[in-house]
Amino acid sequence: ALALHLHSIKNKFYALSAQTGATKVDSWIDIEGGIGNVFANASLRKNFPDLPYHVDGDMAPLSKNGTFIGHHIMMPREGVAIHINAFNFPIWGMLEKISVNLMAGVPAIVKPATITCYLTEMMVREIVDSEILPEGSLQLICGSARGIIDNVETGDIVTFTGSASTGMMLKANPRLIEKAVSFNMEADSLNCSVLGEDAVPGTAEFDLFIKEVQREMTVKAGQKCTAVRRIIVPEKLVEDVQ
């Protein structure tokens, strides 16, 4: 229901997205890619029972006579998911994360990057006004959130997307260590694209290489985790690539 609702009003977000400095393609990835994440997780939810747990896989016999067995089950956390997000995808960054915790029945506190938080706020306002989610299941903090993880408990989850330096600082918070809080970090990455020696001009592989490198360098001005930052090309093909 949430995915369908957001898809029906998606055009509302494009004008404000442009004010973040995003091109139409950038906005399309952020807005419709984010909503697509909600659709994907909604489909995944259909694979789970309407129970507060999910039996994962088959029983594993651990003793000769079956007196000792093992069986995994999935259960939701009993706390809250705190999502600290990056500036480059104010909608996608939030939707891809909250889709997971909402599927598990876990509420979320979202802290978007201050510089583009107004776009996240618009999306959250539309979600809240729709009354599709239970009251309080999605909360937003714009601006400074200093101390946001200083009071987390064992059942809470913290996710962070941003720079490695900030992520390491958060990860070292004594409270996270003391309470064994789950911390997931997506930080700086160094991605490369490698052109094979047989991928010469005129081949589909060469054309795809040029297309993807150009796209990854220009979408969001290269400010995203999957951007190609190193291009490795056989010496004999350097001139063709240039």
Predicted regions and their residues:
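Conserved small-residue-rich beta-alpha loop and adjacent elements
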Residues: 50-134
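ALDH superfamily catalytic-core signature
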Residues: 126-131, 155-157, 166-242
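Hydrophobic packing residues within well-ordered alpha-helices of enzyme cores
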Residues: 17, 38, 120-123, 151, ...
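N-terminal Rossmann-like NAD(P)+-binding subdomain of aldehyde/semialdehyde dehydrogenases
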Residues: 1-65
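Hydrophobic residues in well-ordered beta-strands that form the structural core
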Residues: 110-111, 142, 185-187
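Flexible, acidic loop-helix segments that line cofactor/substrate-binding pockets
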Residues: 14-32, 146, 188-191, 198, ...
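A structured beta-alpha segment of the ubiquitous adenosine-cofactor-binding alpha/beta core
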Residues: 70-71, 138-159
